[in-house]
């Protein structure tokens, strides 16, 4: 009898331990195991940050950004990456060089929106723009599109159902005289949500995002759009700006925003992001507060179906303002800046590193 009681007790303990382990995973999804590894690929030829990336027909295209060394003129870079050859090729530059651009692919072309521009040499490079462009990789050609209703930079874009939604960003207050954004110039984060229709070259204003922000991440999964993290108040890290961990869901079919989703494990802005297998992957980013400033190595993925986050192996080199894109099961993280915020003349804080996370658990 005592032996049977002992066996029953041990069985109950085993069951309880299993249940407890499952409960811990549910309560702390960031601790759930995940598979994958980082691989090193051909470095980016001209290190830059605040660049935009997109995938078209199995190749990556990187646009815009800011150079190293405290230079203020955006170079308007365009590069194509061929994963088969592990090689970068320079393409026709942007007609109007910009940084902090929102980009999305649709039917073999890349659509780019807004960003910060420089009107004259020596001036600020942070005039918010309403320009929209179509880049055709097959022809290596550019076409100007109908301008956005709202001038802004540091917005994000995603395509659902043949329309491209440009959401958030930073810009001037309504009615303000045209000026460059700066910490001393009154400006604001935006919840603007504007849908571009490539078929008709027209815009439609949609329901604004509840949490106005800039420098966020975005992903489209199962017909819905998710905006993750970013920066509230100012687009300039530090000062009045602060990172947010808020995740919001937009349904283009109903034109409405849903209830708040599971918050990010790490509040951050200026991240790289990409979507694969029903998950949205976020890497890197930056933060500042009164005590310190820095950049992140963290790689985390959000699963909208489960409304859960998972933690994955960190990128080898911490950085922010990267270009990012997905080809097959590889999440590419390209160039970026090694520190938070700006640098002085002659200081090179951008890096040419090109890493890809090989996803093996989806």
Each model region followed by its residue ranges:
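Bacterial N-terminal signal peptides
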Residues: 16-29
């Amino acid at each position: 009898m005592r032996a049977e009681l002992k066996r029953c007790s041990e069985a109950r303990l085993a069951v309880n331990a299993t249940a407890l382990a499952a409960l811990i995973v549910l309560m702390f999804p960031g601790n759930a195991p995940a598979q994958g590894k980082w691989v090193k690929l051909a470095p980016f030829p001209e290190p830059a940050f605040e660049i935009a990336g997109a995938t078209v027909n199995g190749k990556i295209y990187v646009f815009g950004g800011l150079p190293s060394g405290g230079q203020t003129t955006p170079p308007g870079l365009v590069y194509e990456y061929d994963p088969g050859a592990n090689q970068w090729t320079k393409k026709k530059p942007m007609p109007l060089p910009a940084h902090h651009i929102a980009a999305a692919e649709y039917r073999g072309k890349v659509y780019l929106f807004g960003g910060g521009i420089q009107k004259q040499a020596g001036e600020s490079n942070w005039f918010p723009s309403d320009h929209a462009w179509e880049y055709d990789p097959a022809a290596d050609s550019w076409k100007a599109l109908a301008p956005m209703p709202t001038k802004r930079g540091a917005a994000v874009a995603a395509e659902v159902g043949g329309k491209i939604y440009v959401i958030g960003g930073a810009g001037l207050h309504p009615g303000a005289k045209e000026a460059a954004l700066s910490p001393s110039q009154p400006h604001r984060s935006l919840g603007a949500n504007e849908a571009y229709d490539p078929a008709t070259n027209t815009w439609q204003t949609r329901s604004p995002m509840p949490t106005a922000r800039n420098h966020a991440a975005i992903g489209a999964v199962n017909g819905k759009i998710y905006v993750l993290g970013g920066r509230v108040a100012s687009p300039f890290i530090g000062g009045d700006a602060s990172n947010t961990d808020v995740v919001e869901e937009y349904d283009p079919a109903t034109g409405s925003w849903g209830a708040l989703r599971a918050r990010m494990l790490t509040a951050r802005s200026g991240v790289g992001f990409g979507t694969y297998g029903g998950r949205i992957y976020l890497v890197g980013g930056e933060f500042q507060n009164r005590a310190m400033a820095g950049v992140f190595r963290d790689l985390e993925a959000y699963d909208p179906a489960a409304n859960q986050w998972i933690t994955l192996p960190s990128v080898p080199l911490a950085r922010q303002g990267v270009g990012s894109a997905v080809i097959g099961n590889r999440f590419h993280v390209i160039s970026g800046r090694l520190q938070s915020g700006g640098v002085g003349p002659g200081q090179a804080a951008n890096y040419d590193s090109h890493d890809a996370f090989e996803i093996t658990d989806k």
